[in-house]
UniProtKB/Swiss-Prot annotation:
Keyword Cell cycle: yes
Organism: Nocardioides sp. (strain ATCC BAA-499 / JS614)
One Pfam family from the record: SepF
Subunit-level organization: Homodimer. Interacts with FtsZ.
Gene Ontology, cellular component aspect: cytoplasm
GO process terms (BP): division septum assembly; FtsZ-dependent cytokinesis
Protein known as: Cell division protein SepF
InterPro entries associated with the record: Cell_div_SepF (IPR023052), Cell_div_SepF/SepF-rel (IPR007561), SepF-like_sf (IPR038594)
Cellular location(s): Cytoplasm
Primary location group: cytoplasm
Length: 165
């Protein structure tokens, strides 16, 4: 039998071990000293199991930026016409700065437009803002501290609201 097959047979216990061990390592039985183990003291202190006080979750859900009751006066709206998904960063940066953003996705293919709407929806959800569909492939993203009046939304829908920055 070849060496590899013999070793496999020895490993599986089908053949006797040939005893190919070096004699220089010898028997280690005499080299070890036994140590007595000391018993470990167990803690017998009784802890009272009290439930933790319940906190109101609505206090933790407040937005991190600014007071919620203050509504900023609308001074400008940024209109973007992205052509690829790579322009999502521009949408996010303008929205993060507190500027309402109009996304006109009519120049994008449907797959990238869907990705950008998903990005915008996540952005708006994370910051507690709002997203509104103005017309087909045109969306208004409003930060949480900004209120866009109904007549402004109507002007946006009619196409009369351009970038005022």
């Amino acid at each position: 039998m070849s060496g590899a097959m013999r070793r496999i047979g020895e490993y599986l216990g089908l053949l006797e071990d040939t005893g190919r061990y070096d004699d220089e390592y010898g028997d280690y039985a005499g080299d070890y000293e036994t140590q007595e183990t000391a018993p470990v003291a167990t803690r017998s202190s009784k802890r009272e199991s009290r439930p933790a006080p319940v906190s109101d979750l609505s206090e933790r859900r407040r937005p991190a930026s600014g007071p919620t009751g203050v509504v900023a006066e609308l001074s400008r709206i940024t209109t973007l016409h992205p052509s690829t998904y790579n322009e999502a960063r521009t949408v996010g940066e303008n929205f993060r700065d507190g500027t309402p953003v109009i996304m006109n996705l009519s120049e994008m293919d449907d797959a990238d437009a869907k990705r950008l709407v998903d990005f915008a929806a996540g952005l708006v959800f994370a910051t507690r803002g709002t997203i509104e569909r103005i017309t087909n492939k045109v969306f208004l993203l409003s930060p949480p501290n900004v209120s866009v009046a109904a007549e402004d939304k109507q002007r946006i829908a009619e196409g009369g609201f351009f970038n005022q920055s």
